[in-house]
């Protein structure tokens, strides 16, 4: 059979069947001309690795797929049974007739962005159910003579902690568990440089991400005899799933993109793809948001909130977001011990309800938003008292609470209907609500669903994610004009699967500016700034001018009490908002250029990044001084996108004063000398606005 080649921009993956019909992978992504690759030479297909190795097919290749058949069979020998292509959609069918099993390897190419999506769909026609134990979304092999892996592990308030190291011989694993907040343990994103560490502008590098809202396992495997071959197995976990005849099981999707010239061009491709194919309304500007949580926690009433609205409007914000604590009648939400599940406004705190609050926001020139946690319930609630069987629990075990709450069982259709109906009713009762923050603050600990029979309890981990996604689909469909923020104790759901129903994600509950700068830097390899919500807070008593400057390089907002601001702090916050509104189109829709990375050798505590508009005629550059620097040594910030034939007007601003330094420079001198670095003091910032229009 002729080889199958599926292109994604400058890159491609190719397959061919061997003489036994087993599908082999011939190549995965390009190498520079003249570089060796494992598929060079006049070799037969048998010399190449299996494209999707199954259990019992080849013991030397760890399986991407494993099942136990209805009759107890475990060996699987799938052979090529067909190939279909329609536009950019490709389907390669593998079949094992003895098992009455089909495995469709599905690929979707995005040539304009150079992105490839890959997943598998499994079905069978046996006499009864089978158990799928492992089903990878993808298991490609690539030529990687000197592979270096960048991974992003985490914890609460420590998401996106990056580490880069060579991939040793053996198996390296990135994994997370759970079905609610898996990204608190490890991010499903990674970078793999194939020929030593990649730079921003040099070196072949692959980016990958499993688009899944539950636990995942990414394995990077090198063998002693063929260390230049690297197999990446990408899948969800726990993966055990009881599958009935004629039912199609689809794995999560794996997202790939490739750059031969470093991480910068890779980032641009992913950002354009995320805006165009993942997040909602990817070409729309996001508002400046004022959130109440760190200003009030549970201590507020209507009068206090209205005073805060006046202060929020004075800072120049556009959206007022009321966080946790607004609901509960019989069990009012005065702390985290009661009220979850009873989504009616607390009449003691909000006698006019949500409509009165929305009207107050509108009078202050603000739109109004609301926090919800619809997947959770407190035992101290009307909902739990009425439906104690609606929670995820294993019979015979105590129901352990986290944050005094339990997880609703979304596998029950009536629970899904409750979640969708709750959000719909809130929006119907207060038509002025324009924004929802969807949160989730605990994991599943006693996995059990009353909706699943005893022999299907293992399906809970997968079915919970799919049920949640169905609820999110319904909510997004019934509220197309409502902006949605994705949150899960911070960045517990920062995945490309769940983001499809949301406009932005809360990256972390950690809002220390220096820590957030590093988190935002690492996340920026994959997510555009408009998707990363960043708020100015008083975390650790930090300097607010510096905190503003860090938040301005993402989707800018505040989470503090305006009444607590000193005159100098208020001036800095107002100036930050004004500057952000001027450059917001660049930050949210422009091309990101990472210039000086955090903690780079020789950086002397400097960090810098910029955003460019069309043809690089307009740009904004943010410079940060994380640690004190000696003023005796000159330093600069590179401007690699400058056009040597243009002349730029440059405005240099800080948030601690109301003036600006204005100069003019030709592009040639900017390319050669960069921008003079003015900062020496710890936790200070500078903003440059460049305009050649």
Q: What are these model-predicted stretches?
A:
Residues 10, 190-192, 200, 600-644, ...:
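Carbohydrate-binding surface patches
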Residues 378, 384-417, 462-563:
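Glycan-recognition surfaces
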Residues 46-76, 202-219, 256-279, 317-324, ...:
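Glycine-rich, aromatic-flanked loop segments that form ligand/cofactor-binding clefts
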Residues 78, 241-260, 683-690:
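Short Pro-Gly-centered flexible turn/kink motifs
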Residues 120-122, 297, 328, 346, ...:
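Active-site and adjacent substrate-binding regions of carbohydrate-active enzymes
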Residues 662-693:
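C-terminal beta-strand-rich structural cap/linker in extracellular carbohydrate-active enzymes
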């Amino acid at each position: 059979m002729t080889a199958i080649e599926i292109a994604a921009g400058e890159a491609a993956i190719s397959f061919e069947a061997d003489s036994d019909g087993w599908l082999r992978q011939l190549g995965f992504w390009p190498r520079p001309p003249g570089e060796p690759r494992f598929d060079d030479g006049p070799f037969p297909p048998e010399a190449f690795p299996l494209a999707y190795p199954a259990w019992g097919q080849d013991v030397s290749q760890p399986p991407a797929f494993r099942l136990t058949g209805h009759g107890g069979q475990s060996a699987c020998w799938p052979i090529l049974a067909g190939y279909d292509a329609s536009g950019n959609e490709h389907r390669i069918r593998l079949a094992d007739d003895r098992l009455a099993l089909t495995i469709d390897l599905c690929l979707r190419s995005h040539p304009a962005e150079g992105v490839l999506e890959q997943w598998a769909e499994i079905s069978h026609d046996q006499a009864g159910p089978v158990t799928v134990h492992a089903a990878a979304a993808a298991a490609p092999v690539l030529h990687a003579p000197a592979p270096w892996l960048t991974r992003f592990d985490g914890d609460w308030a420590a998401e996106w902690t990056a580490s880069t190291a060579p991939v040793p011989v053996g198996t390296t694993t990135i994994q997370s568990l759970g079905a609610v907040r898996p990204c608190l343990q490890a991010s499903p994103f990674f970078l793999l440089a194939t020929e030593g560490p990649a730079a921003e502008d040099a070196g072949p590098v692959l980016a990958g991400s499993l688009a899944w809202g539950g636990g995942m396992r990414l394995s990077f495997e090198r063998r002693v005899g063929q260390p230049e071959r690297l197999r990446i197995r990408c899948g969800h976990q726990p993966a055990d799933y009881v599958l009935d005849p004629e039912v199609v099981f689809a794995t999560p999707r794996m997202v790939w993109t490739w750059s031969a010239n470093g991480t910068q061009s890779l980032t641009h491709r992913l950002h354009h793809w995320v805006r165009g194919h993942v997040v909602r309304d990817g070409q729309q500007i996001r508002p400046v948001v004022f959130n109440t949580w760190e200003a009030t926690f549970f201590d507020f009433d209507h009068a206090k909130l209205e005073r805060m609205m006046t202060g929020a409007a004075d800072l120049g914000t556009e959206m007022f977001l009321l966080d946790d604590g607004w609901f509960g009648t019989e069990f009012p939400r005065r702390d985290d011990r009661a009220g979850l599940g009873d989504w009616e406004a607390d009449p003691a705190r909000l006698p006019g309800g949500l409509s009165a609050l929305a009207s107050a926001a509108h009078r202050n020139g603000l739109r109004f938003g609301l926090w919800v946690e619809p997947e959770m319930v407190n035992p101290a609630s009307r909902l739990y008292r009425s439906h104690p069987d609606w929670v995820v629990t294993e019979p015979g075990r105590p129901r352990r609470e986290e944050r005094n709450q339990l997880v609703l069982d979304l596998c029950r259709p009536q629970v899904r209907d409750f979640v969708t109906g709750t959000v719909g009713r809130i929006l119907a009762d207060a038509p002025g609500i324009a924004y929802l923050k969807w949160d989730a603050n605990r994991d599943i600990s006693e996995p059990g669903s009353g909706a699943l029979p005893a022999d299907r309890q293992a399906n809970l981990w997968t079915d919970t994610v799919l049920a949640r996604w169905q609820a999110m689909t319904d909510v997004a469909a019934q509220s197309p004009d409502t902006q949605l923020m994705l949150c899960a104790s911070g960045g517990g759901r920062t995945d490309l699967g769940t983001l499809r129903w949301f406009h932005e994600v809360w990256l972390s509950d950690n809002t220390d500016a220096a820590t957030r700068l590093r988190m935002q830097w690492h996340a920026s390899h994959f997510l555009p700034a408009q998707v990363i919500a960043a708020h100015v807070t008083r975390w650790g008593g930090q300097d607010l001018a510096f905190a503003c400057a860090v938040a301005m390089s993402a989707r800018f907002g505040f989470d503090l009490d305006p009444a607590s601001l000193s005159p100098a702090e208020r001036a800095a916050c107002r100036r930050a908002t004004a500057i952000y509104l001027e450059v917001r189109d660049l930050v949210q829709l422009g091309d990101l250029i990472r210039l000086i990375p955090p903690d780079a050798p020789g950086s002397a505590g400097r960090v810098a990044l910029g955003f460019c508009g069309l043809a690089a005629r307009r740009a904004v550059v943010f410079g940060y001084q994380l640690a004190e620097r000696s003023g005796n040594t000159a330093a600069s910030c590179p401007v690699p996108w400058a056009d040597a034939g243009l002349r730029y007007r440059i405005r240099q601003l800080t948030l601690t004063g109301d003036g600006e330094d204005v100069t003019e420079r030709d592009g040639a001198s900017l390319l050669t000398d960069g921008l003079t670095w003015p900062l020496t003091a710890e936790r200070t910032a500078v903003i440059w606005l460049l305009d050649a229009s």
